[in-house]
Amino acid sequence: EVKKETGIDAQIWAARSIAKVFDKLNLPYSRTLKTQSPSFTKNFLQEHEHPLVKKIAKAREINKAHTTFIDTIIRYEHKGRIHADINQIRSDQGGTVTGRFSYSNPNLQQIPARNKDLGPLIRSLFIPESGCEWGCFDYSQQEPRLVVHFAATTPVIKENISVKEIVQSYTNNDIDFHKTVSDMAGISRIQAKTINLGLFYGMGKAKLQAELGLSTKQEAEELFNKYHDRVPFVRDLMHETSRWASREGEIRTLLGRGCRFDKWEPAQFGMHTPMTWEDAVKKYGENRIRRAFTYKALNKLIQGSAADMTKKSMLDLYKEGIVAHIQIHDELDLSVESK
């Protein structure tokens, strides 16, 4: 349909090819800061209003489902089961620095959940033990709750009126964090959720702008300023966590696990290769260096703490004789004996 309407045989995974479609339709799109290459994020394509752009997004989803999920699952199936490699923490074999589980051979955490058509079809390939039902249990808004917890227990932030307002809302009922923030900031829920998660994950302004589908830097700045003016505690927590990591060289998760910041870089802004303290001092001088990656401190705090919670729940279940089939981020899936 894209070729029929535009005359372009678009390669759905090639940004330059998609750009030709946008140019033909006279539609604006973002470019990368460094090389000015066309940039099309998943959110940008999915949220776009033009019907042909939505078809490109859908074609991508179908293609990814087939090549990444279905073909991979079939390749690793053995006697009706799949035994993936589980990585506890970052190593040469894979894993994450935050302590969250990751999977390889195959990566079962990539099984789609949100797509209303493909998700149920692919997930239906996984079945419980004989005579049981499939149980799926997850934490409600695990990461936003952790952000509120740390904001409400950090001395320089906890007195902020926006923190008190959200804490009170959680006390009264099970709120939708992203909807509450959107109401406070006067922006849409999808914008609030994108900014929230972007800040939680240490996403830069340029990436956030692309995720939000905003074509100009001015539009993005206006939206960010509106968000931070009315919901300042997220930015304050991000800055305070970064300062702590710079000062102490580590942050501690909810259950006390340490995430270290032991690489250094020159203090001036720019693209630099992080190195050991000894090498950095030798190259730049002791008073002209700073710890690297401290902007990721909030991300490590939140995801590391989420990993603590989920792993503790797995241990608690194991002590009761219950072993999950799979753990996906904040979700545990297991066989439940039918009543």
Model-derived segments and spans:
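Conserved "right-hand" nucleotidyltransferase catalytic core of DNA-directed polymerases
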Residues: E1-L118, I127, G131-E133, S140-E143, ...
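Short acidic alpha-helix initiation/capping motifs at coil-to-helix transition points
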Residues: I12-W13, N172-D174, G198-M203
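Conserved catalytic alpha/beta cores of large enzymes that bind or transform nucleotide phosphates
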Residues: L125-V147, I161-L197
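Mixed-charge, glycine-rich, non-catalytic linkers/tails in nucleic-acid processing enzymes
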Residues: E1-Q11, A151-N172, K226, R230
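Short active-site loop/helix that positions an aromatic residue
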Residues: A19-L25, S140-K158, S338
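Histidine-centered active-site/metal-ligand motif
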Residues: D174-H178, N299, H329
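Short hydrophobic/aromatic beta-strand micro-patches
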Residues: D333-E337
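Conserved catalytic core of nucleic-acid polymerases
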Residues: L27-P28, V181-V323, S338
